[in-house]
Amino acid sequence: MDPSRRPPKDSPYANLFDLEPLMKFRIPKPEDEVDYYGSSSQDESRSTQGGVVANYSNGSKSRMNASSKKRKRWTEAEDAEDDDDLYNQHVTEEHYRSMLGEHVQKFKNRSKETQGNPPHLMGFPVLKSNVGSYRGRKPGNDYHGRFYDMDNSPNFAADVTPHRRGSYHDRDITPKIAYEPSYLDIGDGVIYKIPPSYDKLVASLNLPSFSDIHVEEFYLKGTLDLRSLAELMASDKRSGVRSRNGMGEPRPQYESLQARMKALSPSNSTPNFSLKVSEAAMNSAIPEGSAGSTARTILSEGGVLQVHYVKILEKGDTYEIVKRSLPKKLKAKNDPAVIEKTERDKIRKAWINIVRRDIAKHHRIFTTFHRKLSIDAKRFADGCQREVRMKVGRSYKIPRTAPIRTRKISRDMLLFWKRYDKQMAEERKKQEKEAAEAFKREQEQRESKRQQQRLNFLIKQTELYSHFMQNKTDSNPSEALPIGDENPIDEVLPETSAAEPSEVEDPEEAELKEKVLRAAQDAVSKQKQITDAFDTEYMKLRQTSEMEGPLNDISVSGSSNIDLHNPSTMPVTSTVQTPELFKGTLKEYQMKGLQWLVNCYEQGLNGILADEMGLGKTIQAMAFLAHLAEEKNIWGPFLVVAPASVLNNWADEISRFCPDLKTLPYWGGLQERTILRKNINPKRMYRRDAGFHILITSYQLLVTDEKYFRRVKWQYMVLDEAQAIKSSSSIRWKTLLSFNCRNRLLLTGTPIQNNMAELWALLHFIMPMLFDNHDQFNEWFSKGIENHAEHGGTLNEHQLNRLHAILKPFMLRRVKKDVVSELTTKTEVTVHCKLSSRQQAFYQAIKNKISLAELFDSNRGQFTDKKVLNLMNIVIQLRKVCNHPELFERNEGSSYLYFGVTSNSLLPHPFGELEDVHYSGGQNPIIYKIPKLLHQEVLQNSETFCSSVGRGISRESFLKHFNIYSPEYILKSIFPSDSGVDQVVSGSGAFGFSRLMDLSPSEVGYLALCSVAERLLFSILRWERQFLDELVNSLMESKDGDLSDNNIERVKTKAVTRMLLMPSKVETNFQKRRLSTGPTRPSFEALVISHQDRFLSSIKLLHSAYTYIPKARAPPVSIHCSDRNSAYRVTEELHQPWLKRLLIGFARTSEANGPRKPNSFPHPLIQEIDSELPVVQPALQLTHRIFGSCPPMQSFDPAKLLTDSGKLQTLDILLKRLRAGNHRVLLFAQMTKMLNILEDYMNYRKYKYLRLDGSSTIMDRRDMVRDFQHRSDIFVFLLSTRAGGLGINLTAADTVIFYESDWNPTLDLQAMDRAHRLGQTKDVTVYRLICKETVEEKILHRASQKNTVQQLVMTGGHVQGDDFLGAADVVSLLMDDAEAAQLEQKFRELPLQVKDRQKKKTKRIRIDAEGDATLEELEDVDRQDNGQEPLEEPEKPKSSNKKRRAASNPKARAPQKAKEEANGEDTPQRTKRVKRQTKSINESLEPVFSASVTESNKGFDPSSSAN
């Protein structure tokens, strides 16, 4: 029903009997020729009440709404589906009978249900078709189920015909039945029309009889008015009889319902119409799910009044408590005519859409499909055409490509045969290579055999030479074996022939033996000729010099074939005794050495005395020279060549043990040497009363003054520390070899330092006739032993034995543990140190500079010179970091002038301990004396002054009337009263100087009468005021832009600024009190500071620098008075507690054990100073906190010096323990910069020390060694490893500390022997400081590997730890074990050409004494290194320390140096050094390590300078 026509809710039945709308109601006209009816019987009610949803009014069946209960609203799609075009359906008789039977059966069932459920009585059911029933719809309408069962129209058969909507079509049309109908009155004027054929169908279809049908009650649910009733009656559109083909007669039209009722009244027996409304029907309008049956209008949340059926729970006068539930939304029912029209519009729209959209769409689809078919057909045609063309083209192409294919086949065959030929060539090359290798192996075997024969030749030649030289002494010296005589050769070697086997000798061996004998004979003959010629010439010179008699040659026969400990030239029996000229006692092994030297001299052999360092080689050589003078009457001249550091030692030892032998110390400047050369006159030599018997000089001077020494025929040449001639290509070696001397003796503790070539150089130097081929010697011995030491390979023991056999006749080697049982033990301890945090940062930063893997891969194993230098530079930098970070750039401290004399005070307390602050023991050079009488009568009597009359005058009266220091008198003295205002002051009185001191008259008077402490306090305060003026000036300069240029204004501003900065001298407690500004003290009040405080706090650091490093400082002027009270007064003033607090921040009193402030009231000046804090700090407070109890005067920062180096911290602890144990220490370092740091450390610790390095002169060396040996108060001797490790006797020390190890481990061994030698009475301990997990460990490991050869060759010979490093050595120092293994594996994979190129390189890395690396040619290096002095000459000291160099009398030495340079007598090493092209490691890296040749380091001698 239309909501607008709904009756009011308060009277739902108000318009029920309003007949006016009913009378005016017009029956709708039929719109179609098709008869429409209401809902068919398939719209069966499925509601909860179980009723049939079919509305009938006055016998007419109303059309049902086919909407489902599940659906909430009608949509356009549903409207389109529910079309109104219902077509007539034809039903056959059989079909009709079946439907009728089913209808009757359902009617019975529903009748039973109605009887069982009285409130829900059902009407007669409508027949239901099984063809087009609504299956998915729930029956119902908008009228809430009002029931009108049947219409009493006569067309019953047509009414029961099922109808479908437009979407459901049934082609079976039920035929119309033309029987007379029967009528069933159900009461209330409602009559049902029964078809006439019903009785006929009762029996056949088992239908209920007419009498069995009882209709009791019918309920119409919902609200009904006449309007809706008229619409229901009008819905019966077809009342006429249907024909079989579905075309019925048209229904008559009525103007109104009243007219229709009048027309139908004649046909109805009971035309009455009655309507009964029951409570159940009224209640049936309550929606399902309502809480109750009472209707209430309630305002919803959206603000709309809605009707709710509620249940009243509680009711009062002014309130109701109800329970409600929202009813389901009712569906709005449209007008059937509107629905039909809407459905027709939808059909029309559908057709329009079909015409407009679907037809066009299908046309497009058809067109597209047709186009696609066309395209596919064309494509297929193109494919077929292409295939055909390909076949045709292929047929044409085959003849054309035949030549191409033929050429390709030919080319493939050619490549195949080329490959085959190449493989065959490689196979042939392989076979040839194998054949060549086999031939090479045969050649090597043959060559090895030849080498063995040559070696045997050399060994036999050596022994035969020794045998001939030994037997030569038994015969006439003038006789010689004839060269062509064979019999003497067979006679002299009976033992050798007997020793050989009796079997037939090989002709080749026999020939070799013959060559050996003749070669030995030739060598003996040549040596004998040389010796005879020298003796003849010597005799002539002696006769010329009026010698007393002929030579008395005494020889000792016999030899034994023993090891180096007992050489083959050692006689079995000896008559040699200790010479009387030797004022000493020789030990047993020294007597054997003297005996061996005598025997070698008699045989004409030169020898090498290679005893271990410290066994007295110098003593044996001096005893041998005394033996020649005493037994053979040979008084020289003897030439002793030694390093510059031991020249004084030789002179002292000879004068001590052989006072009868005169020495000529040939060293000094050019003028001194010129005077000394006057004694080198052949006419004055060769006799006992000659001017000298032994000339002592250095290697460098010997090469420099070579032309003067060639004139002399030296009877014997002794070379001490003979490793200085280790290179046969050096100028030094060639010069000494060219000297005319009868015999040569080499003294060395390490005859082999770097390689086996050096051993050959020494052997060739002593026996040039035998050892004349260096290549063969190097090929026989050098390779195997060196490879074993470096790489751990197998060592040929037979090869080592052959080397021993060659060395037997010419070398005597003893070690300490074998020959000296009373020598003290030596213990070596390696102390591992940790790197400090600063060192670790430096070390890691330097190590990260380069990647070794990238370096190797980028060069394919080839290391360029520049990259090797870079790597070596990294190694050197890492070593410097391990020693001390300040080696890069020394943090030189600035020192003020300390005007005082510092005496040797007690040892300082341990670092960091807080001890009582005491004065450092310094004393002011200014001392004034006060007579005792003056002190007692004037100074001490402070209360009264005595006059000559004897009457006492009070001090106040005296100062008032007789004080010349009154401010008034001083002012008058400065400004005389007679000078006018406008006149220029031409002069002033006695106190006119005070204006220059910036002192007022009051301040001058105060200082004149105050005590010493008050003067000191005033000076500090006055200095602070001066500093405050500087602050004002700096502040004013920064504010110049805001100030006027007027000077007067600037002065005023400056004065005001100074007044603001000056603290108040008068302070009260009220001024110091904090006053709150509110009811409670704000928490942020402490954060607010004045601008003055901020300014003063900002300059605190700058002020500290001025305070702690003043320009000058001096102890108080010493006052000397013989009065005891004066001494007490001075001491009291100096140690006054408040004065100490002022200087150091606190004062220790006797009442407390710790530092605290004195309890007494401070001096006013101290109060004034304290009031200016934080500008003013205690003068020495910070220094005391840093340095502990040390004196405040320091030129460097020892705390930073110690904490920055882990080694120095370890050394500090070690030296304290050694000092406590009364030990004496030799401290060796390599770099001079490191020695400077150690020297500063010694000064800080107050250790007495001496320092010896390359800058020390010969005289200074002698004096320092002597002082250290005789003075027990000297605790430490600082030495350079290279300058102080040769020939110095320092047995007074029992501890050796290596702060840094040298690149050459031989130098470290020599340094150890400075203390561990004969004359040492204490056990020697050697400490070596090594940083953990650094490059130092690898350097030490490398040295230990090379020391292994020393044990292999001759128990003390071969040490390859030299100053020259190859690329592999440098890289190995920077890599760990894993990386080294990988690098070695990659190096093995290199081609042979690369390895050969690397082997052919003759450049090596040289490390000088300063730790710098240069790349030099190997030949030049050998020549220059062996031509230079291990220690620099005293007359030309070269040191990086300019202060020490300038201190060695530059005025006296400058002319000498100028003359030497003018005469061209500079050292060859220096000349070569300047000309040689060197490459510094710092060219590509940091300039700190510059090694380039400059004026300052020109001619630098690395062997003579310490690092």
Curated annotation (Swiss-Prot):
Residues covered by the Helicase C-terminal domain: 1210-1360
Biased composition (Polar residues): 38-67, 1491-1507
EC number: 3.6.4.-
SMART domains for the chain: DEXDc, HELICc
Superkingdom to which the source organism belongs: Eukaryota
Principal subcellular localisation of the protein: nucleus
Cited PROSITE patterns: DBINO, HELICASE_ATP_BIND_1, HELICASE_CTER
Residue span(s) of domain Helicase ATP-binding: 598-769
GO MF annotation terms: ATP binding; ATP hydrolysis activity; DNA binding
The entry's keywords: Activator, ATP-binding, DNA damage, DNA repair, DNA-binding, Hydrolase, Nucleotide-binding, Nucleus, Transcription, Transcription regulation
Domain DBINO, residue spans: 350-475
Residues holding ATP: D611, E612, M613, G614, L615, G616, K617, T618
Phenotype upon gene inactivation: Decreased homologous recombination frequency, but unchanged sensitivity to genotoxic agents and efficiency of T-DNA integration. Differential expression of several genes. Compromised ethylene-induced H2A.Z eviction dynamics. The double mutant ref6-1 ino80-1 is insensitive to ethylene (ET) and exhibits reduced levels of EIN2 associated with a shift of the chromatin landscape to a repressive state at its locus (e.g. H3K27me3 and H2A.Z).
Subunit record text: Component of the INO80 chromatin-remodeling complex. Associates with REF6/EIN6.
Function noted in UniProt: ATPase component of the chromatin remodeling INO80 complex which is involved in transcriptional regulation, DNA replication and DNA repair. Binds DNA. As part of the INO80 complex, remodels chromatin by shifting nucleosomes. The INO80 complex controls ethylene-induced H2A.Z eviction dynamics. Positive regulator of homologous recombination, but not an essential component of homologous recombination. Not involved in the illegitimate repair pathway.
Protein's recorded name: Chromatin-remodeling ATPase INO80
Organism name: Arabidopsis thaliana
Gene: INO80
